[in-house]
């Protein structure tokens, strides 16, 4: 957890220092920082400092990862040239609603258990169903945008960047699906498992997509 946090923060610093300002850079930076924040939150959950720390860390972690699929949709729109597209505003607004729920609703997260390799977050059955639909729905929407818009792109840079965004999304979506298929009981740990695999996504964002879509300093 802490190693992944350090790597993702290092990638964020690298992107901030090396890539010239652009909307794509800002989205990638936000994604990297939020990924790192979730890893840090898991670290504090596993530290078992106090019930308050565990609850606060769980809430902060969930608020962080809630924005990731929305940023994925926004990044796909941005790379494909659909600046200020209505879908970007809609998914970010939806993400904000979920973040407020996880941050302030008393019963948003019932319990958080550290197993060593990952953290199990216990939500209510309804919250799990709604949140899973939101999260995986946006991931598949990102892949759909990548597929459709990459076929329309005349720019090789944009087309390749969209392809890499699709690869990056699948790099954590597919392994998580395989883990769940093999170990169905891992359902409550999916956020933790997914963000563990997402380090591959972070590397693709920092070293491939960011340099291709924005000039380096």
Where are the model-predicted features located?
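Juxtamembrane membrane-water interface segments that cap and precede transmembrane helices
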Residues: 113-129
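Amphipathic, well-packed alpha-helical segments that form the structural scaffold of globular domains
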Residues: 144-145, 175
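Alpha-helical transmembrane segments of multipass membrane proteins
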Residues: 12-13, 43, 75, 173, ...
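Interfacial "cap-and-anchor" motif at the non-cytosolic start of specific transmembrane alpha-helices
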Residues: 158-217
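Glycine/proline-rich, flexible active-site/cofactor-binding loop segments
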Residues: 7-10, 170
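Individual alpha-helical transmembrane segments in multi-pass integral membrane proteins
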Residues: 1-8, 19-107, 125-140, 188-203
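Juxtamembrane membrane-water interface segments of multi-pass membrane proteins
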Residues: 13-20, 77-87, 145-163, 209-217
């Amino acid at each position: 957890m802490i190693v992944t946090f350090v790597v993702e923060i290092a990638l964020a610093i690298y992107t901030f220092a090396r890539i010239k300002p652009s909307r794509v850079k800002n989205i990638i930076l936000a994604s990297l920082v939020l990924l790192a924040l979730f890893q840090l939150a898991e670290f504090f959950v596993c530290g078992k400092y106090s019930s308050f720390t565990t609850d606060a860390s769980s809430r902060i972690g969930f608020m962080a990862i809630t924005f990731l699929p929305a940023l994925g949709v926004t990044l796909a729109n941005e790379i494909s040239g659909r600046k200020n597209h209505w879908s970007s505003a809609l998914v970010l607004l939806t993400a904000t609603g979920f973040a407020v729920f996880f941050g302030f609703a008393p019963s948003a997260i019932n319990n958080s258990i550290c197993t060593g390799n990952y953290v199990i977050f216990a939500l209510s059955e309804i919250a799990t169903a709604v949140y899973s639909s939101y999260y995986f729905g946006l991931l598949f929407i990102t892949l759909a945008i990548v597929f459709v818009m990459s076929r329309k792109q005349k720019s090789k840079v944009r087309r390749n960047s969209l392809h890499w965004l699709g690869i990056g999304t699948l790099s954590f979506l597919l392994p998580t699906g395989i883990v769940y298929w093999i170990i169905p009981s891992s359902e409550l740990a999916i956020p933790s498992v997914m963000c563990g695999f997402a380090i591959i996504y972070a590397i693709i964002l920092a070293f491939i997509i960011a340099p291709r879509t924005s000039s380096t300093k």
